[in-house]
Amino acid sequence: MNLERWTQAAREALAQAQVLAQRMKHQAIDLPHLWAVLLKDEGGLAWRLLEKAGADPKALKELQERELSRLPKVEGAEVGQYLTSRLSGALNRAEALMEELKDRYVAVDTLVLALAEATPGLPGLEALKGALKELRGGRTVQTEHAESTYNALEQYGIDLTRLAAEGKLDPVIGRDEEIRRVIQILLRRTKNNPVLIGEPGVGKTAIVEGLAQRIVKGDVPEGLKGKRIVSLQMGSLLAGAKYRGEFEERLKAVIQEVVQSQGEVILFIDELHTVVGAGKAEGAVDAGNMLKPALARGELRLIGATTLDEYREIEKDPALERRFQPVYVDEPTVEETISILRGLKEKYEVHHGVRISDSAIIAAATLSHRYITERRLPDKAIDLIDEAAARLRMALESAPEEIDALERKKLQLEIEREALKKEKDPDSQERLKAIEAEIAKLTEEIAKLRAEWEREREILRKLREAQHRLDEVRREIELAERQYDLNRAAELRYGELPKLEAEVEALSEKLRGARFVRLEVTEEDIAEIVSRWTGIPVSKLLEGEREKLLRLEEELHKRVVGQDEAIRAVADAIRRARAGLKDPNRPIGSFLFLGPTGVGKTELAKTLAATLFDTEEAMIRIDMTEYMEKHAVSRLIGAPPGYVGYEEGGQLTEAVRRRPYSVILFDEIEKAHPDVFNILLQILDDGRLTDSHGRTVDFRNTVIILTSNLGSPLILEGLQKGWPYERIRDEVFKVLQQHFRPEFLNRLDEIVVFRPLTKEQIRQIVEIQLSYLRARLAEKRISLELTEAAKDFLAERGYDPVFGARPLRRVIQRELETPLAQKILAGEVKEGDRVQVDVGPAGLVFAVPARVEA
């Protein structure tokens, strides 16, 4: 027995048989050990060969395992070191069979033949030899890795035409032009290899599936009738190819099978760019170069699919590229997407067991097109439908909120009941009786609701079964029509089909007024999913939100004192956007806030973010003092290729990509380098910006606020001289025109001049600042009260028309917070105290009148 003349897989099988014998403590390696190893993999070569010969590999495997368990166990160093005479004879017979079959190596299938001869109850040698020839496709074993080349197409490919015949592919709607062009190229004499090129998600693979469906229906020219489209899995070809040359051998076997089929098989390689360089090692030939000769001669028909970016990999190899004919696949329009979704609707309805309304389909196409800008139609719209249906299905399969709330309440009462059982006083006994009565009432109510819910679920289960049967009947009708079994087709179409359709309709009708089961995916569900994905509120305005938007000025005034013009301008822009009236290609609003320091420009931006998004974190703050040099401008959109930091992306673009719905504050805009304004022009006009990676970032759902101190001296001077607001605004505008280019100023929605704060407004700000301090003290359970005189004292000290409200913060820190902190540290003010603050001759006076008991 010469193991050098065995294939790698056969040698490994013998080695594993030895390991098995050692593990089971058997003295010698016998036939059952080798059978157990060969039959371990259900899809393996031995399994397939025995099935083809008409044997039952499963029964054989169980028989050999029983035999193994009966073998005696031994101890010592000699365990599993010898072959039994019957196994040795079978292995020598395998070598004789190798010579008979004109092979160069003993392969796994040859081993199976030899073992089968030595095992009673298996098919004869001739039957096994016939199965072996069929499995090998008439080839002999000439290499050490020959097993991986048997039935290569079946092993490494997926037959799309078979899947289409079984109705397992989704219907392909439209795309007739592209399918016609692919057919046209396939019918050429040479270079008949179309490659579908398009953005990810536009439906390149679907076009090939559409062609497979047409071939099955016979809706193709004579030259393509009866052909098979096999999708080659590059991953399967590469997987497990441990030894050099094994990958090339597998691919060569695939190419040979396709060539031998004489045009019956059309190969399809998704992600075609993976062919370039696949299996490349030092001195090895990559897949692309192995395909070239067959492609050029027209012996092999290949359809490829790849994206625009990845097609560049193929363009690097002109000899490979010239063998392909590109077919460009454009993104479908919203209208075409709606047609595609209507065609797919039934598949998703059957899968999820829900109904998808037409309004949901239209919403999925329009909302995904408008708000999910980084992905392509129809893929993103299909994803929306799928997720919304999955969400509804999940809701249907879990307990309704109404029942859930009652059960939680019941559990709470049961816990309370157990605690009260230990108490003996009359009050507790009284309460216990009341609780038990309430628990009994709740139990009855829950049982009633559960019964109703179960009844509705039962109807739903029947509906899903009917939908599945309906789907199967439609598939059977298609199959019968293809096979010209017209009697069967008519029987199903005019007998079974209307009956099932009526059943589905009747069950759906029963659920229409259901209390717990909502069966239909609506546009509201789609809007909800879009909001989850993007953070952009696109769902219909709820009553509470309408109120909030109508009272937006009031909300903003809670934190920003005065500045009515600015607040009104911002609130109007937000209302226009949420009512759906804003220009869809521009940001929600773009404002330039001007005014002296400390009057609330930045505070308004923060307040707007907190009001709209319930958190100040939703504000993207770009401090323009960091962008004063020319080279710093690239940080906004990312460093160019080749520079350090290219991978990180831009500070502005990355922030907006992660939060497409936000307030962007460009603080101190006049300090920025002039080149920054060139970037801003694009954002303000088109609502988009391309970063250094070539990705388009969408700014259409952002509020852009720029703040500046330009013209502050003029504002103060105008107020001292008593100029009207309009004149101050015009004077400031003249200063702006000297500093900013007209095309920049012209793109802003509103230029708002903030007024300096008056004494009365500073007094209001005292209240706001004190509320923040009280909130901090509340954590220490200390309450703070200030007399009106104390508040006036702080406002008086903190008023400065030039510096706005900022001096007030310093006054509060100095006069109120610092003395209070000293008193807390000295133990004069403790947890639970009430501190009263008044004015004395030397400033503020603190008093702790009475301790509040904890």
From Swiss-Prot:
Q: Which UniProt keywords apply?
A: ATP-binding, Chaperone, Coiled coil, Cytoplasm, Nucleotide-binding, Repeat, Stress response
PROSITE patterns xref list: CLP_R (PS51903), CLPAB_1 (PS00870), CLPAB_2 (PS00871)
Segments for region (C-terminal): 757-854
Region Linker: what ranges?
A: 332-535
Coiled-coil ranges per UniProt: 382-513
Spell out the SMART domains in the cross-references: AAA, ClpB_D2-small
Q: What is known of its domains?
A: The Clp repeat (R) domain probably functions as a substrate-discriminating domain, recruiting aggregated proteins to the ClpB hexamer and/or stabilizing bound proteins. The NBD2 domain is responsible for oligomerization, whereas the NBD1 domain stabilizes the hexamer probably in an ATP-dependent manner. The movement of the coiled-coil domain is essential for ClpB ability to rescue proteins from an aggregated state, probably by pulling apart large aggregated proteins, which are bound between the coiled-coils motifs of adjacent ClpB subunits in the functional hexamer.
Query: NCBIfam families in the record, alphabetically?
Result: chaperone_ClpB
* Record-given protein name: Chaperone protein ClpB
Q: Which organism is it from?
A: Thermus thermophilus (strain ATCC BAA-163 / DSM 7039 / HB27)
Organism classification: Bacteria, Thermotogati, Deinococcota, Deinococci, Thermales
